[in-house]
């Protein structure tokens, strides 16, 4: 800090945005990860700062919001609260959702609950679906209409959309987990290499979640590539997974779990949010384009996305 004090930052909210500021401040290229450990030493140094928050664009920690320690000679209360960073000069990926594909793929579909077995296993439906299955009744009506014909029994109303996620960075996007930790999904017959590759949410004007979104685990592969790039990663068998530079992974609106369950949502105006790499497990060049945020208009029968823009997740 400006007063020249030597000590440590203690925080249980230390993250990649704070690490980005530190790496910039010490003249390094980019942040690879933020650490909370005394593995690198400094356990016995005085606590100088705590409860720090940065947005990642500051030039130094002094520009962030923080609280100074009110006493001298006090160390971090726990070794796991000692903040550290790992900087890198390596190339990094940069994920970005395709706004056009998202807007133009939006549609509503009603499906009987008995046809959503795999989706229920992967927790892709709102909690009322599991109650409906348990009691054998529809949470909002005794019957519904699909394609002009009555469909009796529990049904769900699904807001479907496509996710086209491009890698515009300088390195391939690879899952953090080693392949030995990948999860086999018997319903879809492939491995998921990331437990939460994207989040889907519907929010009200106050930022409160009004429809139960979900964390979508994914099998990552190259589906589309710009010339002269070629596909490298595949979901077949136990192949390497990832998204190559200049390529995109595409999850079409007709694929299981490419939806938000809006069975319990009342008509109105909302905010739709799709966020990729939401837990920042994989370092990127830029996090300010990871989310697609749109205005959602829903009248109970149809829905429309408008004014979509890229933002930080």
Language-model features, listed with the residues they occupy:
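Extracellular/luminal regions of secreted and cell-surface proteins that mediate adhesion/ECM remodeling
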Residues: 91-313
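Typically disulfide-stabilized, N-glycosylated extracellular/lumenal ectodomains of secreted
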Residues: 1-91
